[in-house]
Regions:
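Structural/interface elements that position substrates and couple domains in central-metabolism enzymes
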Residues: 2-498
């Protein structure tokens, strides 16, 4: 895991590395923060809680959702379906136009969501508009009339791999400039513990001051998104919803909001616990993926099939949880959240060395796969430079169009840098740009392309791929997902598991 520049305060690493100390440090964030808080955001007017509760229970509360992407759009649809009047705000006017026109904007798997939103629009329960300029008169701004504002904006990494809260801060400034008192504000973006009560609340304050307004009195809470692109919507709806408030009243009204749309709402007792829980969920997954990825490299050196090892180990009914290896990690959370977790630990004097190591292992996988492909070609008398490589899959996971942090894009850059001639195939992706600036336009998979390639590199295990055709026609298949294992006897030395 890369670190901040050596001359930055964050680069001064503490020596402590006790995981229990790290969790205790996070716990201290929420100790004593409930009772007696005098911050204006924590002190709505007496009776405001009852009024908001009533509006939430009878569905008359007006809801604004800032950010209409993979998190905000499904959330807006769910709340509109529960009976609320929902306004979606997004900084991309073209996205707003397409959503308003009933078009799917989250890939081909989002047609059902697009139809649902179109129905809510027709019934007057959902509308979407581009985020207005901050200097728009308060009375005309859509946030001025809302009772609930939910923030679902990206929380990426800065170039030095530290948390980038610029989108969260921009949302806070917008809210501060326009929200009325006694509004419920919920942050859903994944972030480190203390953000809601700290950086986010500070941004709201700054927005108030910049607009010449007195300090706001708001309900403030955190409820982490748990969206899983590609998951069946009926399964996604059953995922429990965590809620943590900055005060007991804030948590209570937030629970009431989400209970209207989620079958299982879990209060955590504080915003910090909810923030840390979301991070830890993804750190847990990242660490276990790193473990099986490292096991793959070790077992490969021994000539042992890691997938057969995992299948055998998974027969134990206790004490083992199978994770699958791959070409690296992708998506909007898993590759990023460990860095947020480790950075937050450093701010409290604790170094999360195990988490850092997991990040290093996962980020190294595209390099290892490239080396494995190069070695497989050389064993057959072919150099990687000048070789025709057919890359199957650009999305970061099966059966989605999501390219965020996809290891496939890193792999393509490495292959191009090595001098390979690369053709890509992905039935869910129309075009893509690699981190190195290469413009990709995937083509359909057919027998001729398989036969013409010096090597076929399986990166994403899309169900649309014709596995028997690949097994029959590929001269060399380097499989990072294990989808061709069933054809190992047929393929013989033409199959390399990586």
């Amino acid at each position: 895991m890369s670190l901040p520049p050596s001359d930055s305060p964050q680069s001064r690493r503490p020596e402590a590395s006790d995981p229990a100390a790290l969790l205790r440090a996070f716990a201290r964030l929420s100790e004593g923060t409930r009772a007696g808080s005098e911050h204006p955001l924590d002190a709505p007017d007496p009776g405001a809680s009852t009024d908001l509760m009533d509006a939430l229970r009878d569905r008359t509360a007006r809801v604004a959702v800032l950010g209409q992407g993979y998190v905000g759009l499904p959330l807006a649809a769910r709340l509109a379906g529960a009976g609320f009047e929902v306004t979606g705000l997004d900084g991309d006017p073209e996205r707003c136009r397409r959503v308003a026109a009933g078009e799917p904007v989250l890939g081909e798997g989002s047609t059902e969501l697009a139809a649902e939103l179109a129905g809510h629009q027709a019934e007057g329960r959902y509308s979407i508009r581009a985020t207005p300029a901050r200097d728009q008169p308060p009375a005309d701004h859509p946030l001025a009339a809302c009772d609930v504002a939910i923030v679902c904006v990206p929380t990426p990494l800065a170039p030095d791999r530290t948390p980038d809260l610029s989108h969260v801060r921009a949302a806070g400034l917008e809210l501060g400039a326009h929200l009325a008192d006694d509004t419920l504000v919920v942050l859903e973006s994944t972030t480190y513990p203390g953000t809601t009560r700290g950086a986010f609340r500070d941004a709201i304050d700054d927005g108030r001051r910049a607009a010449g307004r007195s300090p706001a009195r708001l309900f403030l809470a955190y409820s982490p998104e748990r969206e899983d692109p590609g998951r069946d919507p009926s399964e996604q709806r059953r995922v429990p919803k965590l809620v943590g408030g900055t005060t007991e009243a804030s948590e209570a009204v937030t629970v009431a909001l989400y209970e209207s749309a989620y079958p299982d709402v879990v209060p955590t007792g504080s915003a910090e616990v909810a923030e840390a829980a979301k991070l830890f969920e993804n750190v847990f997954r990242a660490v276990n993926i790193a473990l099986v990825n490292e096991a793959k490299t070790v077992l490969d050196a021994m000539g042992i099939d890691v997938w057969r090892v995992l299948d055998a180990a998974a027969t134990k009914p206790f004490g083992f949880m199978p994770f699958q290896p791959g070409p690296g990690m992708g998506g909007h959370c898993i590759p990023i959240d460990p860095f947020y977790f480790a950075w937050a630990g450093e701010q409290h004097g604790v170094r999360a060395r195990f988490v850092e190591l997991a990040g290093e292992v996962n980020r190294a996988m595209p390099s290892w796969v490239t080396q494995r492909l190069e070695a497989a070609l050389e064993e057959r008398g072919r150099a990687l430079r000048g070789a025709h490589v057919l890359v199957l899959g650009l999305a970061y996971k099966r059966d989605v169009a999501d390219l965020r942090e996809s290891p496939a894009l890193d792999l393509v850059d490495r292959l191009l840098f090595a001098g390979a001639q690369v053709i890509t195939v992905d039935p869910h992706v129309e075009r893509a740009t690699t981190p190195g600036g290469a413009e990709l336009e995937p083509v359909p998979l057919d027998a001729a392309r398989l036969e013409a390639a010096d090597a076929v590199l399986v990166v994403t295990d899309h169900t649309a791929f014709d596995d028997p055709l690949i097994a029959e026609r590929a001269r060399l298949a380097v499989d990072t997902r294990g989808i061709l294992r069933a054809f190992a006897h047929q393929m013989g030395e033409r199959l390399v598991l990586a």
